[in-house]
Amino acid sequence: LATAPRVPGFTVLDAAVMVDQWRTGDPDNRMLNPDQWQRVGALLAGLTPVQRASLDDLLAAAGSSTQRALLLSTLASGATIEQVRFVADAIRSKSDAEIVRMLALNTDEPTGRTGATYDGAPVIQDPTTGNTCGSTSLLGLVARVDPMLALWLTSGQRAPGWNPPYLAHLTDAQWRGTTFLERFIAAQHSVLTTTDSDLSTWVEAVGTPPWGAAALASLGSSTTYESVLYDDQDPELTRELMSRAAAAANNGTPVPFYVGDDHVPRHVMLITGYADGYYTVYEPGSGSVTRVPESVMLGTGKPDAFGGWAHIDYLVLPVT
C-alpha cells in the first residue's frame, strides 16, 4: 500500500485495487471495466463519512484484491453499503477463481462439445420456448458487472432490497427458486418481458429486439450501449465494428450480437473476449463457449459458429 498512487476521490486501498486489477495479464479477468471505475469514483464522492468508513472496513477485511474489486463492482452497480456488506459476507470464503466463475456464469472458457455448466446444470436458454436467447445473453452480460445478480443466480442468495427493474416480473416463488437453472430460466423470461414490453414495443414471441437489448444492457450496467446494423458486404464497416467489439469485450463489456439469414435476425450470442485473432463466443442454445476465428466474424469464413445461421445482422456495442 505504501507504493500505491494517490488518486483524487480514492483512498490508498482503492488505488491499490485499481493497480492490481490493471496488472492482470488477461484483461478479460479484470473485475471492473473503465465505465465501472468512473462510476465508482462518482459514488465514492457522494458517500457520507460514516458510509465511507463502513466501505473501507469491508475492503480492508476482504481476503484478496479480487474480493475487494468485487465489492467495488457491487458499489458501481448501485448497491447500498448494506448490500455491499451482504455480498462481502457471501463471497468471503470464495477463491478468486470461484469469483471469476460466478460472475461469468462459467461461460468464459471454451467448453468443447459439452457446453458450459454451473453446479451441474447447463447454462442455456429456456429449451421449451426458443425465444430467450437474447435475454440469456443479456443476463450473461449483466452478471459480469452486477455481482448481486451473479450471486443470486448462482446461489439463490438475494441482497436485502435488491430488486432490479429487469427482474420486476418475477414472482415470489421464482425469486425463491431452489436451483441455478430454475432461477436462470425465470430471469430470462423477466428480462424478455422487460425488453419487449417495458423498454420497447415488440412481439415477445420472436424474442428480444436489438434496440431493446441495448436499452436493457445500458439499464443493467455502467455502460451505455447502442444497436448497430452489421453489413458483412461492407469490409471496412465490418472490420471497424468487430474491432470495437473486441476492444469492448477485452475491457470487460461483453457484446451481444444477432445472427440470422439474409433478411431477419434469428438468434443472439455473446462475445466475451478476444485474443490472437479469435473471439470467445457464448452460444445460449447449447451453452457452448467457442473460439471463433476473426475471418468468420468478418463474414469471410465458414459461418459454422453461429448456431446454424449464416450472417451477423446486428451488434449491441458500447457507445464510443
Across the structure, where does each feature detected by a protein language model lie?
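Generic N-terminal leader/targeting and pre-domain segments
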Residues: 1-68, 77
